[in-house]
């Protein structure tokens, strides 16, 4: 066959509407905004080409392989309702394009290069379908939801956490004292903030030691298992693992990682260490909004959430629906199901473009955190259910009587909501009444209710369904 040099349109090779997807294909749904004058078929084909085998011109080495076997294919295009220039382009990638067990390689291929492409005004990856054949090459979360409950001996209610504030500036001893007060008052976990690593005012080893002391002292007082998310995120993978090793030697139950700033390679390494050494792994999503906030460009958080479940983490921050951070209810619950459940049906009303079968990969507990307080407890309990961590930073430490009473208020509120739900009451309709009733016999809760009775974060969500 003679080699024919020159430039030809992508759609001649990469737009294949007749293609029937295979069970082993990775499927992607891209929101494509082509430049004026670029037809959607060409734009969709360009995305498929540039994120798989294509380049801008025909090359003679194409003849040395089977492009039909390895190329990505744009197999369907739908206009986005209400937008004149946006399309959802569906692309199928053969599994052989990806290294086994590597989220890093998956993202480098699918979103690594194509987002700077000149023929596109904007591009957003809305969803991925990960086939079971690829999922089986990943370890996934170190332990999963059921194992975590068994380790902690806590059942039938959401878990409670608190991020220690001020996030930066406390000495290690004062930091440990704040943890102790919260844990003693009734919380299950306290937490390092995402940017607490090892700074001049508090080196990591000192913090780990004082927090371990807080854990053991509060456990002895309450008879409950306690934890503090010790942030092992560091400048190098070796240093990160060193911190995780020290946490294990202290006998604490859980460590933490910032998975986007730390990177997927580091995160997967830490997840493997945590499974091998019995540590739970809490994941913070710092930097996610840089990637997922714009509606027409970037990557939706549901993709980052799926990637985290593959890479490994037992908890991940997922927004609150009711607090100070972005998150619309249906969309949030869509990716919360993708984190927790074994099988999730396609449901476009919740932003789920593909049916996803996780083939027994352990689940991840969603963490609701950011601007929430006791008045939100009924809504949070109803929205997230038992398999969640509800995290109140300011909502614990901002209590007028201090940390421990703040923790008591949150624990009383969550127990009251769970009891009311189990008795068949409607948390959405009767939530305020349930909290008021509980506050009659808990002065700590009554004081918290008084402080935050008028606090609301009323802004419309940016991330809405079309």
Curated annotation (Swiss-Prot):
Keywords: Calvin cycle, Carbon dioxide fixation, Chloroplast, Disulfide bond, Lyase, Magnesium, Metal-binding, Methylation, Monooxygenase, Oxidoreductase, Photorespiration, Photosynthesis, Plastid. SUPFAM superfamilies: RuBisCo, C-terminal domain, RuBisCO, large subunit, small (N-terminal) domain. Its cofactor is Mg(2+). The active site is at 165 (proton acceptor), 284 (proton acceptor). It comes from Ruttya fruticosa. Mg(2+) binds at residues 191, 193-194. Belongs to the RuBisCO large chain family. Type I subfamily. The record marks 324 as: Transition state stabilizer. This is Ribulose bisphosphate carboxylase large chain.
């Amino acid at each position: 066959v003679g080699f024919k040099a020159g430039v030809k349109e992508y759609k001649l090779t990469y737009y294949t509407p007749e293609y029937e997807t295979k069970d082993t294909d990775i499927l992607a749904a891209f929101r494509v905004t082509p430049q004026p004058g670029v037809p959607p078929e060409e734009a969709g084909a360009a995305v498929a080409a540039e994120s798989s085998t294509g380049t801008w011109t025909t090359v003679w080495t194409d003849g040395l392989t089977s492009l039909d076997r390895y190329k990505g294919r744009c197999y369907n295009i739908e206009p986005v309702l209400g937008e004149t220039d946006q399309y959802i382009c569906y692309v199928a990638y053969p599994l052989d394009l990806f290294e086994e067990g590597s989220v890093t390689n998956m993202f480098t291929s699918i979103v690594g290069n194509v987002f700077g492409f000149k023929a596109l005004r904007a591009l957003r990856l809305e969803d991925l379908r990960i086939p079971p054949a690829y999922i089986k090459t990943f370890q996934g979360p170190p332990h999963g939801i059921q194992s975590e409950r068994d380790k902690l001996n806590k059942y039938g209610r959401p878990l409670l956490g608190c991020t220690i504030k001020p996030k930066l500036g406390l000495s290690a001893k004062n930091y440990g004292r704040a943890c102790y007060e919260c844990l003693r008052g009734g919380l299950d976990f306290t937490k390092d903030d995402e940017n607490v690593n090892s700074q001049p005012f508090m080196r990591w080893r000192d913090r780990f030691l004082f927090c371990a002391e807080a854990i053991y002292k509060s456990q002895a007082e309450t008879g409950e298992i306690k934890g503090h998310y010790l942030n092992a995120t560091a400048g190098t993978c070796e240093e990160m693992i060193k911190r995780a090793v020290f946490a294990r030697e202290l006998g604490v139950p859980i460590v933490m990682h910032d998975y986007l700033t730390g990177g997927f390679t580091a995160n997967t390494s830490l997840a493997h260490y945590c499974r091998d050494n019995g540590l739970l792994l809490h994941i913070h999503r710092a930097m996610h909004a840089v990637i997922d906030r714009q509606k027409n460009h970037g990557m939706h958080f549901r993709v980052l959430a799926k990637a985290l479940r593959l890479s490994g983490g037992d908890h991940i921050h997922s927004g609150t629906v009711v607090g100070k951070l972005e998150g619309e209810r249906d969309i949030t619950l869509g990716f919360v199901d993708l984190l927790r459940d074994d099988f999730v049906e396609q449901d476009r009303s919740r932003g789920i473009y593909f049916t996803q079968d996780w083939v027994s990969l352990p689940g991840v507990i969603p963490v609701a955190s950011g601007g929430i307080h006791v008045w939100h407890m009924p809504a949070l309990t109803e929205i997230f259910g038992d398999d969640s961590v509800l995290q109140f930073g300011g909502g614990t430490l901002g209590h007028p009587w201090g940390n421990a009473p703040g923790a008591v208020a949150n624990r009383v509120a969550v127990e009251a909501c769970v009891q009311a739900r189990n008795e068949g009451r409607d948390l959405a309709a009767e939530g305020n009444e349930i909290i008021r009733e509980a506050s009659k016999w808990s002065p700590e809760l009554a004081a918290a209710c008084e402080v935050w009775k008028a606090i609301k974060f009323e802004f419309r969500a940016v991330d809405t369904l079309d």
